[in-house]
Regions:
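Function-dense linear segments that define catalytic or interfacial modules
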Residues: 337, 397-423, 428-430, 435, ...
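Active-site palm subdomain of RNA-directed nucleic acid polymerases
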Residues: 447-459, 463, 783, 787-808, ...
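C-terminal polymerase-core module
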Residues: 491-498, 502-554, 721-769, 773-775, ...
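Conserved catalytic core of nucleic-acid polymerases
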Residues: 472, 570, 584-585, 589-592, ...
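Active-site-proximal helix-loop-helix substrate-binding element of RNase H-like nuclease domains
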Residues: 99, 151-179, 299-302, 337-449, ...
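Extended two-metal-dependent nuclease catalytic cores across DNA- and RNA-processing enzymes
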Residues: 23, 73-252
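Conserved RNase H-like, two-metal-ion catalytic cores of nucleic-acid enzymes
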Residues: 3-4, 8, 14-53, 69-70, ...
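Conserved "right-hand" nucleotidyltransferase catalytic core of DNA-directed polymerases
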Residues: 233-353, 361, 365-366, 370, ...
Length: 857
């Protein structure tokens, strides 16, 4: 038989520190459980054990504490974020059928040692742990699997006798002798004072054991200082040997058959995993069933509609319904359901396609769907407009939990409808569609409770149609121009590379941080921060600190900028140009926690515009023949939102008087009339204005604007003194977030902040920065979405040929026939400025040009 024994505390600890904090929507921490389960499942996959035992320490003192008062005396208690996960993990393991083993007076290591020592010679034991104490237990049929979580993924290193000899030069049992000499700071095992790891290993390799060392202490060839240390701490060495020796005879059950996994309690295990929102773990476990409902207990599984063959009569009956749920599988099939039946329409059949398109346009039928954007896209492709979509399950789930990893339909059914019984079906999509009604109902109830149903129906769903249209139209690009620009960049990159090699005096891989660090800080002797295990840091912050004094560093920074511009933006754009010469980016509504729209293939939000060369990229985005581009962006929208949310009179008055807010801020911070403010002062005030929005501190501000930390601190204090409303807002929003567990925008979009309850100071500080910033950034994102909807609808209402084609941050771009361009610019500005009524007027400037570069003005 194969026995797998897990050191529960050790692996849970490794998982906790190896994965960033994760929480459920209601704020329960789950990262340690998630990591532990991934490690356990990976171990089972690798080992294929016949039996599994999971051991844990107990809080009660052990025989080692009685032997030595100082044993583990320096151990801090578990962080509360980890401690709360321990009982939940044990409950989950028990539900899954694993045997948990504990024994008062003994540690998990002793239980592991006892189980491994009592297996028969023909059996095998695999010990999974996060520390090296168990290496002493290795023998021919006992191996140690050192488990860890790196970059969120489980890893294991296998230790047998050969590996221990290779790494340490000793046998497994001699690992105890090494610990006796060097001690163990984590367990507060004293060892011999002044003897470290290297010396301890060397002594045991040479002399085999502490017994042999002390029996021949006066004769062996060692330094006199080492001999003195060994003599002085002989008692401590032997005490440490006892403390470090794992007990092989703890009073626990050693019958392997008793550790064979029991059948899981499917409902209990699934219920726990659903409540922990661990849907991927649930999928990996392949449990045959789903959880029984937990709230309310009396709830019964809903009776699902059943699949029925499509007939013309049934379709007509469906079309007569006031509310229909449907799942758009592809351009080939669409699944419908109401309370009693599920239908599938074949969109390759012209009659059924025509009925479906008529159904989409029918304003009387309320439609609840899984994903509205693909439905809007299909409608637009066929020259119609989808009407009265009142629920988009994906977008609704996103609003309820914007930090979820995905919004997969099966996962959402498990999360929101745990009482739904999903039987195996030859038509899984029929089952999925049958669940839509219940799922939509649950999500709508939650959204209504959070006052977010209007956000879904008036912003997110209408926006999905706008984005579908933008993706369909795309933006024309100058392919030849991009190719020439890329070639020019290649020439400049090659020239910089040659110059860097010349200054370095050798050729090396500039893109390798390790090689670059050696060249800069060892060969050229540039001042370096402390070297780490992975080498010298050569990130942008480090290099920018050296750039003013060293030409090679300036060249390296420019090299990186041009290489990024070429690979990501030039070559990247060339890969995604369609047959029509246009780029059809995918716009995403569920990728960011603030509500901002993101884009992929390509990511148009990240086109670099701070450097002139980056701005040149805009020249390659064109209007089609006979068309022009209209570009409009908001003026300082986040500061205007801040003024409104903070109800800061000074800032509101400045904006409504059309004053230059940065000059006004500089006037207050530097205590002088606005007319005496210099460009440098205004620039620094601008950094303060926007820095405050993003929760910047004195240290970061000082680096951004090149002043001392004390000066930066004074700028921030003077700013908050003048804008007292902003200061008050910054304090109140954090306090409210701590009470509520979330912050929200003016339109009720939420971001949950479990970090505010963390015992980790850095995480708490991060949570506080987000609490201050998200209502501002999120409200600005909501406003630009509203503006997009208004522009799109007005262009349609006025029967214009102009089309909204791009959104980049606070900027909208419309492509319009030359004859419509002026009117389109007027429409865009008006709709952007009227998107939201606040105490501060929104301001938008529109410009027209043949290229994005020209239209940007």
């Amino acid at each position: 038989m194969k026995l797998l024994v897990l050191d529960g505390n050790s692996i849970l600890n490794r998982a906790f520190y190896g994965i960033k904090l994760l929480t459920t929507k209601d704020g329960r921490y789950t990262n340690a459980i998630y990591g532990f389960m991934n490690i356990l499942l990976k171990l089972e996959e690798d080992v294929s054990p016949d039996a599994v035992a999971v051991t844990f320490d107990l809080k009660a003192p052990t025989f080692r504490h009685k032997m030595y008062d100082g044993y583990k005396a320096n151990r801090k208690g578990m962080p509360p974020e980890l401690a709360e996960q321990m009982p939940v993990l044990k409950e989950l393991l028990a539900a899954l059928g694993y045997q948990i083993v504990t024994k008062e007076g003994y540690e998990a290591d002793d239980i592991i040692g006892t189980l491994s020592a009592h297996i028969a010679p023909e059996d095998e034991c695999y010990i999974a742990t996060g520390d090296r104490d168990s290496l002493q237990l290795v023998r021919p049929n006992v191996r140690v699997l050192l488990a860890a979580t790196k970059m969120g993924r489980p890893e294991t290193n296998v230790y047998d006798e050969a590996r221990i000899l290779e790494d340490y030069g000793v046998t497994p049992k001699q690992m105890i002798d090494i610990k006796a000499l060097m001690g163990d700071s984590s367990d507060n095992i004293p060892g011999v004072a002044g003897i470290g790891k290297k010396t301890a290993e060397d002594l045991i390799v040479r002399f085999q054991s502490i017994d042999n060392i002390y029996d021949h202490l006066d004769e062996i060839d060692i330094k006199s200082g080492v001999r003195q240390k060994l003599t002085a701490d002989k008692d401590m060495a032997y005490l440490s040997y006892k403390l470090g020796t794992i007990d092989l005879d703890a009073p626990v059950d050693t019958n392997l058959a008793d550790y064979v996994k029991k059948a899981p309690d499917v409902q209990e295990a699934t219920s726990l995993l659903v409540s922990l929102e661990m849907f991927k773990i649930l999928e990996k476990l392949h449990l045959n069933g789903v959880a029984a409902p937990t709230q309310p207990k009396q709830e019964k599984a809903e009776k699902l509609p059943v699949y029925t063959e499509l007939t013309k009569e049934l379709f007509e009956k469906l079309s007569a319904s006031t509310c229909v749920n449907f799942l758009f599988e592809s351009k080939e099939h669409v699944w419908f359901s109401d309370e009693t039946f599920v239908l599938c329409a074949d969109l390759q059949n012209e009659d059924e396609k025509a009925r479906f398109l008529a159904f989409l346009q029918d304003e009387k039928i309320e439609k609840k769907v899984f994903s509205s954007k693909e439905i809007f896209a299909y409608a637009l492709e066929n020259g119609v407009s989808a009407q009265n979509i009142t629920c988009d399950i994906t977008l609704g789930a996103y609003l309820l939990n914007p930090s979820a990893k995905d919004y997969n339909l099966n996962r959402l059914i498990q999360e929101y409808c745990p009482s739904t019984v999903s039987a195996e079906s030859e038509l899984p999509l029929a089952s999925d569609c049958a669940n839509l009604r219940t799922l939509a109902k649950k999500i709508e109830v939650k959204l209504e409770g959070f006052e977010q149903l209007e956000l879904l129906r008036t912003i997110e769903i209408p926006l999905a149609e706008v984005l579908a249209s933008m993706e369909r139209v795309g933006v024309l690009v100058d392919k030849e121009g991009i190719q020439q620009f890329s070639e020019m960049l290649t020439g400049r990159i090659d020239a910089l590379q040659a110059q860097i090699y010349d200054l370095a005096g050798e050729e090396f891989n500039i893109n390798s941080p390790k090689q670059l660090g050696v060249v800069l800080f060892e060969q050229l002797k540039l001042p370096a921060k402390k070297k780490t295990k992975t080498g010298y840091s050569t990130n942008a912050e480090v290099l920018e600190g050296l750039a003013s004094e060293y030409e090679i560093v300036r060249d390296i920074l420019e090299y990186r900028t041009l290489a990024k511009l070429k690979s990501t933006y030039c070559d990247g754009l060339l890969k995604v140009i369609g047959k029509d010469g246009r780029i059809h980016s995918s716009f995403n509504q569920t990728e960011t926690r603030t509500g901002r729209i993101s884009s992929t293939e390509p990511n148009l939000q990240n086109i670099p515009v701070r450097q002139e060369l980056g701005r040149e990229m805009r020249k390659f985005f064109l209007a089609g023949e006979g068309n022009l581009l209209v570009d409009a962006d908001y003026s300082q929208i986040e500061l205007r939102v801040l003024a409104d949310i903070a109800d800061d009179k000074a800032m509101i008055d400045a904006f409504n008087a059309d004053a230059d807010i940065h000059t006004i801020t500089a006037s207050q911070v530097f205590h002088m009339p606005p007319e005496m403010v210099t460009p440098l002062m205004r620039s620094r005030a601008k950094a303060v204005n926007f820095g405050i929005v993003y929760g910047i501190g004195a240290f970061s501000l000082s680096k951004d604007i090149g002043v001392t930390r004390a000066e930066a601190d004074k700028y921030i204090k003077d700013y908050l003194h003048h804008y007292a409303g902003v200061n008050s807002y910054m304090e109140k929003v954090v306090e409210q977030a701590k009470k509520d567990g979330y912050v929200k925008t003016l339109f009720a979009r939420r971001r949950y902040l479990p970090e505010l309850a963390s015992s980790n100071g850095m995480l708490r500080a991060f949570g506080e920065r987000v609490a201050r910033n998200m209502p501002i950034q999120g409200t600005a994102a909501d406003i630009i979405k509203i503006a997009m909807i208004r522009v799109y609808n007005r262009l349609k209402a006025e029967n214009m040929q102009a089309k909204l084609i791009l959104q980049v941050h606070d900027e909208l771009i419309v492509e319009a026939p030359e004859a419509e361009a002026e009117h389109a610019a007027k429409i865009v500005s008006e709709e952007m400025e009227n998107a939201c009524k606040m105490k501060v007027r929104l301001k938008s400037d529109a410009n027209i040009g043949k290229t994005w570069y020209d239209a940007k003005g």
